[in-house]
Amino acid sequence: MKRKAIIFPYNAECASLVRNRELLLNHEIVACVSPIGYGLQGKDAAYAYGGENTGIVISDKKISEINFDDLLVCESSSDFDTFIMPQVKLAAECGKNVIFLYNISQQQKKEAEETCKKKNVKCVVLTNRRMDTDKLFEHEIIPLSVPVVFVASVIENTNKFDVQLGLRKFLQEEGYKVSQIGTKEYCELFGFHAIPEFMYANQLSEADKIVCLLYTSPS
């Protein structure tokens, strides 16, 4: 049985979770909650990104009034101490787990983890995979015997992640085994890996990044 999840603070940045909610491995989205200042209350979740109605109405209820198992905290411009931590504390007090869908600072992580630990609930921070690249430099290109598909764009906000999920769904429905690396930290919620952190590192050459990626790609 899938775990009931609330998305907070719901905004266009985490719209992929709603648009592709049927692909989530272990979660069922039961509510999207936004602060009053977002101006989204009472509107369909699709209003945030201009899509077709989803049937999920954005709420400004206290999360304690909703039946759920996990609080999915998505990236936003909202102040962490003013908006995010009060909801984390409330979720913990209700005995619910907290999952951050983006990387937060060490201080923020410590505060959230300590808050959850006091109430014996989990606090998980999903991030890009960190790896020791020094162990990967065998400098031998591994031959690939399967097709490789890249999804890329020259600008932001082109729904790349939705395209990645759409391709995944199509190929799996066609009977293919799909090994995938995605561009969002929360790829694991959909059953595949987030892009490794070293791909964003300046200290590695583009050639070295390719070699490392080949050795860390899931089979």
Predicted regions and their residues:
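Flexible loop/N-cap segments at domain edges
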Residues: 211
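Short beta-strand-centered segment that lines the nucleotide-binding/catalytic pocket of NTP-utilizing
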Residues: 175-188
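Conserved small/polar residues in nucleotide/adenosyl-binding loops
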Residues: 215-219
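N-terminal pre-Walker A segment at the start of P-loop NTPase domains
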Residues: 121-133
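P-loop NTPase switch/communication element
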Residues: 186-205
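Long, basic/Gly/Ser/Thr-rich N-terminal segments
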Residues: 1-120
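Walker A (P-loop) phosphate-binding motif
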Residues: 137-174
